[in-house]
Amino acid sequence: SADWENEDPTCAAKYTIAVPSEVDVETAKFAASYAYTANIIFMASGNKLYRINLDRGQVTELYAYEVDSSAQIASLKFKDPESVREENDGEAEGEYKEKLGMCLGLGINTGEKGVVVEIQLTMAGDISREERSICVYEDPNQPIGKIVDITYNYE
């Protein structure tokens, strides 16, 4: 058997963070990516996305789905949270891998339909200022039903 199978789980650190009053900690969703090694995680609650800097104890609102303030973010996932630049990667491949780990998808339920929003983040965890850094996927002719979870397919 592998060594890791016999190890008890360990906790590397414990943080206490004050979250905004509108955040429901019982239903909040969290995501982390290898691209953010500086103790940054992301949280969604209601229609808002937040960046949490664990080292500084800061919670920053990054995005709100303003079309419907009662919308609920049901899922948030990075395109590839395990994507890491390898030493032998060429420059283009390395940059591509880094961007995958900084692209966050949100599955949002609003009324009777679902909306998928994809956000390109920077190395600091801010929303990129590049054109099309926030893409909203919805088609009134082919509405998405209620979203439970989202995933990425690379085929």
Please give the residue ranges for each predicted region:
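Structural motif
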Residues: 1, 47-53, 111-120
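Intrinsically disordered, low-complexity acidic/Ser/Thr/Pro-rich linker and tail segments
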Residues: 1-23, 30
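Short loop/turn segments immediately following beta-strands, especially the blade-tip
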Residues: 2-5, 54-58, 119-127
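Beta-propeller fold detector
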Residues: 7-17, 60-66, 128-138
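Repeated scaffold domains used in trafficking and secretory/extracellular systems
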Residues: 23-33, 68-91, 144-150
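Short coil/turn segments that connect the beta-strands within blades of beta-propeller domains
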Residues: 38-39, 98-102, 155
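Conserved beta-strand element within WD40/beta-propeller blades
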Residues: 41-44, 102-109
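Short, intrinsically disordered, charge-balanced linker/junction segments flanking boundaries
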Residues: 138, 147-155
